[in-house]
Amino acid sequence: MKLIIFTGLVLFSIVSLIEAQAENEKPCLPEYKVCTHAPGNCCSDLVCDCYGRYKSGAQIGRNCFCLQKGVIYKREN
């Protein structure tokens, strides 16, 4: 009886460990992908950078993209 309980606990531990590793290995978002609803999912060398959209001075939305860290983007006319 003790052997059955011990075996069950070991199997439960193994399954829990596998599930935890699978959650940590979620695919990351590559450069220029939208991250508005998932700001922490950009790949490690990228950052989720957000920009507000305005029309007639009023904000109408927000866009977020995975961009390189430390890079400054400027608007071209």
From Swiss-Prot:
Localization annotation: Secreted
Prosegment residue ranges: 21-26
Family matches, as Pfam families: Toxin_35
Molecular function terms, GO-annotated: toxin activity
Keywords: Disulfide bond, Secreted, Signal, Toxin
Keyword match Transcription: no
Signal peptide: 1-20
InterPro entries documented for this protein: Spider_toxin_CSTX_knottin
Keyword Hydrolase among UniProt keywords: no
Source taxon at top rank: Eukaryota
Gene Ontology cellular-component annotations: extracellular region
PTM (free text): Contains 4 disulfide bonds.
Expression sites by tissue: Expressed by the venom gland.
Family the UniProt entry places it in: Belongs to the neurotoxin 19 (CSTX) family. 08 (U8-Lctx) subfamily.
Identification of the protein by name: U8-lycotoxin-Ls1m
Species of provenance: Lycosa singoriensis (Wolf spider)
Top-level taxonomy: Eukaryota, Metazoa, Ecdysozoa, Arthropoda, Chelicerata
